[in-house]
Amino acid sequence: MKTSLRTLSVALAAALVSPSVLAIEKIDFHGYMRAGVGVSSDGGLAEWQKTMVGRLGNESDTYGEIGLGAEVYKKEDVSFYLESMVSMLSDGSNDSETTIGDDAQFGLRQLNLQIKGLIPGDKEAVIWGGKRYYQRHDLHIIDTKYWNISGSGAGIENYTVGPGAVSVAWVRGDANDVDTRITGDSDVNINYIDVRYAGFKPWAGSWTEVGIDYAMPNPTKQQKEYGGLYDADNAVMLTGEISQDMFGGYNKLVLQYANKGLAQNMISQGGGWYDMWHKTDEAKGYRVINTGLIPITDKFSFNHVLTWGSANDITEYTDKTNLISLVGRAQYQFTQYVRAIGEVGGFYQKDTYHNGSNYKQGGEKYTIALGLAEGPDFLSRPELRVFASYLNDSENGKPFEDGTSNDTWNFGVQVEAWW
């Protein structure tokens, strides 16, 4: 037994001092978190339509992402970088939140290898494989990504062509529990081909990006024989955007088109997920987004997101759906660390059905907050906020107080950070 332990100790010591381990000079630690405490007029914090009316004072969860990465090999222009990330989600209701009873949910978000220096003619281009957040385009104040096909995949990223760079990726994004009436597996394999060109500047201070996403459902033989929802067509999503430097900030205009199973993203604030749960053979949708962050004075800044979307035939019952959403967040800096924050948001959505009926949704949110942050920039984090919010459903949907009220208020404290 002593001989076995001695042998194991020698092996571990040899591994720890091996050249491959010593080559890691530093480990990158990065992540995101939000957590807090609060009450509403009917129990704990209420969360309602935050991708439509804004997230400030309208989040009730505890969420975190912890990432570790390291350059594990470096020789001249060639480098191998490993990246990992796990996430945790809970409602923040208890001291010890575990996976027992789904008190907390843990996920594997990223685990990939990125290689630089092996593509002739462009030492900064990246060959990658594994699972990753892939070039996500974020609208922070409404907590959504309008262009996002993250998942397991592989690709070549940022290969210089002319004034910009091309990225090509193959990513997997399956649909789960499509039709449980089938015996056997009801999950459908879906593969995406993503092609982007970014960096062309038509004039000073501008920046553009265009891309195409092609989604290909890949059902099993049994699923094909069953037909129905499993008989889904390939779909396309086109995205074009132009950004402009403006008064020390920026403004961005985004135009998108999608069809088939991707069309619903245009009115759901989605970023590219395929809808396998409805018949979408004739579906088409369009979306226009305008967003920007403008520092109006040294102390006052303003961030906005305007979304207009329209889609036809996104379900077997729906004729047309229209959405408009506008959210604005203003910030006034009292001192380097203390700020006042206000956020106002509203939306209106109308679904018209083939039988002539319609369904309307709409509402507003108003939030005021006092923030403590590590600096005066609009996105300075970490930040602690004391907030009060009023939420109102203007279409009589009664989403609050167990389906009896159209409005509610929130009061609480939240912290948010990324690093």
Swiss-Prot record:
One annotated Gene Ontology cellular component of this protein: cell outer membrane
UniProt entry keywords in alphabetical sequence: Cell outer membrane, Ion transport, Membrane, Porin, Signal, Sugar transport, Transmembrane, Transmembrane beta strand, Transport
GO annotation, biological process: monoatomic ion transport
Greasy slide, important in sugar transport (site feature) positions: 32, 63, 250, 418
Any Pfam family the entry gives: LamB
Induction: By maltose.
Subcellular location: Cell outer membrane
SUPFAM superfamilies cross-referenced by the UniProt entry: Porins
Reaction catalysed by this enzyme: beta-maltose(in) = beta-maltose(out)
Main location: membrane
Function, in words: Involved in the transport of maltose and maltodextrins.
Record-linked HAMAP family: LamB
Descriptive protein name: Maltoporin 2
Organism annotation: Yersinia pseudotuberculosis serotype O:1b (strain IP 31758)
Gene name of the encoded protein: lamB2
